[in-house]
Amino acid sequence: MMHLYHSSSDRINKLITRAYSTSFSLGILGLNRSLRDPIYGIYGFVRVADEIVDTFHGFDKDTLLKRFWKDTHLALDEGVSTNPVLHSFQRVVNTYQIDRSLIDTFLASMEMDLDDRTYSQAEYEKYILGSAEVVGLMCLKVFVGGNQAKYEELTPFAMKLGSAFQKINFLRDVSADFNTLGRTYFPNVDLTAFDDDAKRAIEEDIAVDFRMGYEGILRLPKGARFGVYIAYMYYYALFQKIMRTPST
C-alpha cells in the first residue's frame, strides 16, 4: 500500500500549491503530466519553509526551521518521511538526483528571514540565490530528466528567471515587507524616501533577468516549455502593472 502514501503525499503538495500560488498552479498545468507531481513536490517543500519564517508568528521560528531542516535530511537519507510534504519532496530529490547543496542553500536563505534586516548587496545576492535561483535549478533538474549536459547549458538561464520572479515579488511587496516584517531586501535603497528613480533602477535590473530567462525558456525540453512560459507571462503581466504604478 506504499503507493497510496506516495500518491496521498503528492496530492497534499498539489493542494498546498493551489492554495498558495496562482502563478505556479497555472504553470504546472501547462507542463507534461509526468512533470506535474515532481514540481508540486518542490513547491510544497519551498512553501512550508517560507511559511515557517513568514507566518508562524508567536512560535519559535528558529527551532521550527532547524527541525524542518533536520527532518528534510532525514527524509532524504532514509527515503521516507511521516511528513507527507517531505516524503513527496525526498522522492523528487532522490529520483532526479537534485544536489543537496541546492536544498541547503535554499534553507539558509529562509534562515536569513528570521532576523529583521536591511540587506547589503552581498546579502541581497545571497538571498536571491537561495530563495529563488536554486529553486529554479531544482525544477530544471526535473525538466531535463537526467540530461546533465542540458542542465548545465540551461543553468544560468533558469537562475535568471528565478531571480526575476523573486525581484518582482520584492517590488510588489516592498511596502508590506518594510512596514510589517521590518525587511528591506533591495540594497542601497532608502524606503522612507523611495522615489520613481529608485524604482526604475530596480525595474531595469529585473528586465535584464527577464530577457535572459526568456531565452532559456525557448531552449527547454518541449514537455516543460509551455508551463514555464505560462508562469513567465503571469509574472511579465505583473511586472508591467508594477511599472505603471508610481513609487508612492
Which sequence ranges carry the predicted segments?
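Catalytic cores of Mg2+-dependent Asp-rich isoprenoid enzymes
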Residues: M1-F165, L171-T248
